[in-house]
Amino acid sequence: MRRFPMLDSHFKKEEFKKAVKENVKMLYRKTIDEATQQQIFQAVSLAVKDVIIDNWLATQKQYEKDDPKIVYYLSMEFLMGRALGNNLINLTAYKEVKEALDELGFDLNVIEDQEPDPALGNGGLGRLAACFLDSLATLGYCAYGCGIRYHYGLFKQKIEDGYQVEVPDNWLKDGYPFELRRPEYAKEVKFGGYVRVEYDAATGRNRFIQEGYQSVMAIPYDMPIVGYNNKIVNTLRIWDAEPITDFRLDLFDKGEYHKAVEQENLAKNIVEVLYPNDNHYAGKELRLKQQYFFISASIQEAIAKFKKNHDDLHDLPKKVTFQLNDTHPTMTVAELMRILLDEEGMEWEEAWEITTHTCAYTNHTIMAEALEKWPIELFSKLLPRVYQIIEEINRRFILEIQNKYPGNQEKIQKMAIIYDGQVKMAHLAIAGGYSVNGVARLHTEILEKQELKDFYEMYPEKFNNKTNGITQRRFLMHANPLLADWITDHIGDGWITNLPELAKLKVYADDKKALQEFMNIKYQNKVRLAKYIQEHNGIEVNPHSIFDVQVKRLHEYKRQLMNILHVMYLYNEIKAHPEMDFYPRTFIFGAKAASGYRLAKLTIKLINSVADVINNDASINGKLKVVFIENYRVSNAELIFAAADVSEQISTASKEASGTGNMKFMLNGAQTLGTMDGANVEIVEEVGAENAFIFGLTADQVINYENNGGYDPMQYFNNDPDIRNVLMQLINGTYSNGDFNMFHEIYDSLLNTNCSDRADTYFILADFKSYAEAQKRVEAAYRDSEGWAKMALLNTACAGKFSSDRTIQQYVDEIWHLDKVTIEE
């Protein structure tokens, strides 16, 4: 069977082989036999890019001809994953290139491994943005991703003595073949200084002029976003920072070395890392700089692009939407106002009318800590004119609140954009945009009824839900080619662009042969992951064991701690009852903790310490293994999703906005073990409660405890010997070589209220026994191999709702109102 139809005559095999050889010669002055694997990767990528650029040009020409409305998707993160394999799949040329490289003596899988994961994001926020760009291109909509070209990303995670160590992720060290530098579109971005007000007699208005500022040049680098089998190539534009003035040789010659490179360092600092530690003033200032830097450059570019083809900026909302991915880009509201007022000479009312019909905001969190607030002192000093504009937005917004709720001072306190010395960015986005969306039905309900209740009461028409989705082209076709081929053999390939077609697989739920094939594919993927674990961790795991997986950003609300405490409980059970019939389990973790997040980093140490004890205990005969996968990222995630039996989605109910890992596991036939939180609720609706393992407090119960009190974790400690035993092991040296203090902070966080932090903030002890019971149900279900296979197949068959294609179409229909574009032959 030919896995992919042939799209492009450029991929005639002989021509492609010739292009690779020529590229090796041109780039490295070598023959193909002398080239390293990295050099072959660069040469192959350039040959592929050559085809992409033809389509990229054709796409731009079509957009110029059709003049469609554009969505600018503004995000601090784009977690793209490797581009080579994904581009080949979307060009429908994977098979041909694989064969061509085979004939040249190279393995495409090995060549793909030479590509670094672009370090442009960290967690679900950035991966969602990447999936959305894939879907926008595949569906044929004109879109630009806008972000920052971080030189070192968040960090590369090393595990040393069980602890996370952060090292720079130098992903650009060999050059990145899938980017184009575009200095002709550079934009100046200004920081600091002061605002001079000058009366303009001609217009009878004040002019506001920023002076005494420092500035940097924002230089765009463009990455192609290839649509599936449609010749459309959209653009991810990431901004690098360069100094306005070059290296000062005169200062250097005087020995003033620091001053000679001052401008260069100012620029470099902005783009070095994603999410610099903001536990101090300098870190906060740098984060704010980063946000304004990419927002200002992106909005300037969007306005310039609009003015090339249109005379009247009042038509901007008909042709442009700025989608703000979380609170980081919400300064867009004020920056757009600045440009319209100061550079385009508009009156406030007309500028506000344009802005509030152009900006739309996606809320990604219920966690108050992530709804960004900036100290006035910092904000007004770094961005004096933008701050003035926000002050005026706030003044007018408060008047609007007073008109609607006369005499209600409490409303003003809760809703003001500037209050108590802070600028509240989510409030700015809601006041200054026309749409506010949550990312799963439960999440949106909680926003409307609880977190953003006052705003919902004032602007109910702005609020809507868009449940997240994932691209099946990366997370099934590329991540799990064996399963992708099997599905296509059974139901055709329509699912590649219409995921609900997976429902056709339901007819195989009682077909023993089909179930056997399905589980054999799962086994082969487990063998593949076991090999990766052996190579990277030096741990031998049994592919016949249950692969129980939790991979996601490390945060207390995601409750990796509950997972590892349960592993400790299981280990205690096996040690106490060595004769018990226990089905072998492999618990797999992968997570990065923010560099300044002490408790999260200590949880990683605990996981690795427990792993050291359990994996080296010969007396349990390998019944239990614990693996922490270092430097979790998109490329190893693809191996993990394909191999998982159990998908751990165990956040405290009401805390996870949506989650998308849950969807990737489901698509690949893993069963969800989780709380009724985020998109888990909708997953259970699709697959049926009988095909998932649900436990724990509900969102309403959690919110009730938080609002009214009454939760005492000490009750569980005092009344449940299993829980008490596990928690005592945190402080009796069991997993710390006799060091009683190593994990004391974790113990304290669960049992001792500390200042504003309530003991067991995320209800781990309340849910522990319910979780353990659900785990017992998992084991019982897995022992029934045919029943388990049916559940696995149905999870894949019911995943159709969770494509980002569906999500994007909903954004288009209900928020953006874009027109499809087709490339004319």
Describe each model-derived feature in a short phrase.
Residues 2-825:
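A conserved ligand/cofactor-binding region detector
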